[in-house]
Amino acid sequence: MAEKQYSAAQMVIDTLKNNGVEYVFGIPGAKIDYLFNALEDDDLELVVTRHEQNAAMIAQGIGRLTGKPGVAITTSGPGVSNLTTGLLTATSEGDPVLAIGGQVKRNDLLRLTHQSIDNASLLRSSTKYSAEVQDPESLSEVITNAMRTATSGKNGASFISIPQDVISSPVKADAISLCQKPHLGVPSEQEINEVIEAIKNSKFPVLLAGMRSSSQAETEAIRRLVQKTNLPVVETFQGAGVISRELENHFFGRVGLFRNQVGD
């Protein structure tokens, strides 16, 4: 008997569960049915609404009550466009929502086929974050980033468009969850000790030096940390120069461009 494959649809569900989602609201349709079929076999509570706007507004209510993104799922075409009022309201009023919409197959996107609208562009002005996923393996990361954006700064709505042949694909990547929400200001002694223990207990720790790391005080602190811990370091291009020549054995390149395999 062939081994059961891990599907993109199940990855979406596992990502939602990893991030504390208990309820999903929406209306099924052909371009998103793989996800609804997976929901039928899972313990997330699915509530089918009579209109996509209702799904978005109920999700907004969940977001307002819990502080976590309420989730609405719809099919392509009018299923997505009917979300607009609900998502715009959530963004305007500061309530976190994650909406997921179906889309035609990737090879149909430029053929002007039935319901092949540009979902992400349609909802960009109504949301804090709007994107379409082209790679099934990146689904969990994109959804997690969308949920982070929905609850960062002023809360609001995020939207993810998923083509039919993406949601139906097998995947190898694991579903991920949100990292701990960052705190502003000086960390407490307990928080510093927790970071120290996390570094000690990690198998493959890495230090990512980004945009704000290149000022003098931050650069000096990072260099002292690397000297003491021997952490490997990767940089964004805005963090270039943080690692000095005497620490070059700890430098593993830059991320984000040119497919630097070591850094990435």
Label each residue range with its predicted role.
Residues 2-264:
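N-terminal alpha/beta PP-like core and its mobile active-site loop of ThDP/TPP-dependent enzymes
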